């Protein structure tokens, strides 16, 4: 299982410890996304920044499309299935399965670990970016609904 974490809010007025945690997660700008494994270390970091990000469990299809559409190599070069198979020696589906299982981290591959996304088409659907998802906003844990949001942002 892996989490997709998307930064929703900016950096103005953020406490120092939360800003440091965002840097550790590589979430430097709004609409940046990282895919991280589910473990105690990352779970604690996500809980600390939950008022500035949204997160949930990413599925295989969304991860494959995220890698192919928004994945980049050093020098901002786009990825293709052939290039990825040559560099990682795995097809995209197998790479996505291993990332979801926690066997491989994206930072261990030539793919940049941060996906730069567009703002969501038609917005966040609900009460804005200052409220939690459970009460109608965009922040915090959203379980499988993160896949819908990522598809709107690709």
Curated annotation (Swiss-Prot):
Record-stated family: Belongs to the universal ribosomal protein uL30 family.
Molecular function, one GO term: RNA binding
Binding partners and assembly: Part of the 50S ribosomal subunit.
SUPFAM superfamilies: Ribosomal protein L30p/L7e
HAMAP family: Ribosomal_uL30_A (MF_01371_A)
GO cellular component, one term: cytosolic large ribosomal subunit
Gene designation per UniProt: rpl30
InterPro entries: Ribo_uL30_ferredoxin-like_sf, Ribosomal_uL30, Ribosomal_uL30_arc, Ribosomal_uL30_CS, Ribosomal_uL30_euk_arc, Ribosomal_uL30_ferredoxin-like
GO biological process: maturation of LSU-rRNA from tricistronic rRNA transcript (SSU-rRNA, 5.8S rRNA, LSU-rRNA); translation
NCBIfam families in the record: PRK06049.1, uL30_arch
Full protein name: Large ribosomal subunit protein uL30
Alphabetized UniProt keyword annotations: Ribonucleoprotein, Ribosomal protein
Pfam families named among the record's database cross-references: Ribosomal_L30
Native organism: Methanococcus vannielii (strain ATCC 35089 / DSM 1224 / JCM 13029 / OCM 148 / SB)
Entry keyword Ribosomal protein: yes
